[in-house]
């Protein structure tokens, strides 16, 4: 057909235009599974509404966690093994603590390390200047001595332990400056100091037993009081390294007198405590022995201080 005829026919008879039909894909509602899906997709469970509960107002709440009973039922073997292992560990810890306390009083040792910086400073001042101190009584609270950090007169193990370690280090320094250092010699220095301390404690305990002294002075108290002499020994050796023998003898002499006064005033209250409480005169024969014992212990401290340090200064 001619194009002009086609145009005329189109003008005379209007034709309906066909639009392509659009097929709408149904939107799946939350919680509805895809009919073409064989298995549930658990990886996107939270996006489909399984991981949270929705309130009527649109607020979502987190999913409830499984209860311990449900967790136990899920894996009973491992949970029973874990519970059994925890029970064994607790029983073992209790048994070890009980056996350790039988030989080493851990709970009592905690008292002797209950110190702070202020106590250490005041105690060191008391060891170097005991002449300025007036009240030497140990404070008690409900028949129990207060912690050392609250009472400068209470014995502690922190200062003696640190002083002993520092003494060994200073001895190694002194031997090194004299080209005499060796691990064996340093070990001999430490073991000899520890051996003398052990002999002191045993001798005092035996003397207290022979004199039949009823005192609250314990073995740990003796170790604490006898360990304070290492502080003066450190000062003497350091002054000897800096100023020679003159500085050594001056500082060590001062520390020897100070430790003698400190031990007399401290042990006198411990050893003669029962006699003073009973009102027994100090001039009695029994109390005279106690006074001699106190003076002997105090006099032994300067002698040991010199014996353990004189060879370190040249």
From Swiss-Prot:
<dbReference type="GO" id="GO:0005794">
    <property type="term" value="C:Golgi apparatus"/>
</dbReference>
<feature type="topological domain" description="Cytoplasmic">
    <location>
        <begin position="1"/>
        <end position="156"/>
    </location>
</feature>
<keyword id="KW-0991">Intellectual disability</keyword>
<keyword id="KW-0256">Endoplasmic reticulum</keyword>
<keyword id="KW-0653">Protein transport</keyword>
<dbReference type="GO" id="GO:0005793">
    <property type="term" value="C:endoplasmic reticulum-Golgi intermediate compartment"/>
</dbReference>
<dbReference type="GO" id="GO:0120316">
    <property type="term" value="P:sperm flagellum assembly"/>
</dbReference>
<keyword id="KW-0472">Membrane</keyword>
<protein>
    <recommendedName>
        <fullName>Protein YIF1B</fullName>
    </recommendedName>
</protein>
<dbReference type="GO" id="GO:0006888">
    <property type="term" value="P:endoplasmic reticulum to Golgi vesicle-mediated transport"/>
</dbReference>
<comment type="subunit">
    <text>Interacts with HTR1A (via C-terminus). Interacts with ABCB9 (via TMD0); this interaction allows (but is not essential) the ER-to-Golgi trafficking and strongly depends on a salt bridge within TMD0.</text>
</comment>
<dbReference type="GO" id="GO:0015031">
    <property type="term" value="P:protein transport"/>
</dbReference>
<keyword id="KW-0225">Disease variant</keyword>
<feature type="compositionally biased region" description="Basic residues">
    <location>
        <begin position="15"/>
        <end position="25"/>
    </location>
</feature>
<dbReference type="GO" id="GO:0033116">
    <property type="term" value="C:endoplasmic reticulum-Golgi intermediate compartment membrane"/>
</dbReference>
<feature type="modified residue" description="Phosphothreonine">
    <location>
        <position position="13"/>
    </location>
</feature>
<feature type="topological domain" description="Cytoplasmic">
    <location>
        <begin position="263"/>
        <end position="292"/>
    </location>
</feature>
<dbReference type="GO" id="GO:0006612">
    <property type="term" value="P:protein targeting to membrane"/>
</dbReference>
<feature type="transmembrane region" description="Helical">
    <location>
        <begin position="157"/>
        <end position="177"/>
    </location>
</feature>
<dbReference type="GO" id="GO:0030134">
    <property type="term" value="C:COPII-coated ER to Golgi transport vesicle"/>
</dbReference>
<feature type="transmembrane region" description="Helical">
    <location>
        <begin position="220"/>
        <end position="240"/>
    </location>
</feature>
<keyword id="KW-0333">Golgi apparatus</keyword>
<feature type="topological domain" description="Extracellular">
    <location>
        <position position="241"/>
    </location>
</feature>
<comment type="similarity">
    <text>Belongs to the YIF1 family.</text>
</comment>
<feature type="region of interest" description="Disordered">
    <location>
        <begin position="1"/>
        <end position="55"/>
    </location>
</feature>
<keyword id="KW-1133">Transmembrane helix</keyword>
<dbReference type="Pfam" id="PF03878">
    <property type="entry name" value="YIF1"/>
</dbReference>
<keyword id="KW-0812">Transmembrane</keyword>
<dbReference type="GO" id="GO:0000139">
    <property type="term" value="C:Golgi membrane"/>
</dbReference>
<keyword id="KW-0597">Phosphoprotein</keyword>
<feature type="transmembrane region" description="Helical">
    <location>
        <begin position="242"/>
        <end position="262"/>
    </location>
</feature>
<feature type="topological domain" description="Extracellular">
    <location>
        <position position="314"/>
    </location>
</feature>
<feature type="topological domain" description="Extracellular">
    <location>
        <begin position="178"/>
        <end position="192"/>
    </location>
</feature>
<keyword id="KW-0007">Acetylation</keyword>
<comment type="function">
    <text>Functions in endoplasmic reticulum to Golgi vesicle-mediated transport and regulates the proper organization of the endoplasmic reticulum and the Golgi. Plays a key role in targeting to neuronal dendrites receptors such as HTR1A. Plays also a role in primary cilium and sperm flagellum assembly probably through protein transport to these compartments.</text>
</comment>
<feature type="topological domain" description="Cytoplasmic">
    <location>
        <begin position="214"/>
        <end position="219"/>
    </location>
</feature>
<feature type="compositionally biased region" description="Low complexity">
    <location>
        <begin position="1"/>
        <end position="12"/>
    </location>
</feature>
<keyword id="KW-0813">Transport</keyword>
<dbReference type="InterPro" id="IPR005578">
    <property type="entry name" value="Yif1_fam"/>
</dbReference>
<feature type="transmembrane region" description="Helical">
    <location>
        <begin position="293"/>
        <end position="313"/>
    </location>
</feature>
<dbReference type="GO" id="GO:0005783">
    <property type="term" value="C:endoplasmic reticulum"/>
</dbReference>
<dbReference type="GO" id="GO:0005789">
    <property type="term" value="C:endoplasmic reticulum membrane"/>
</dbReference>
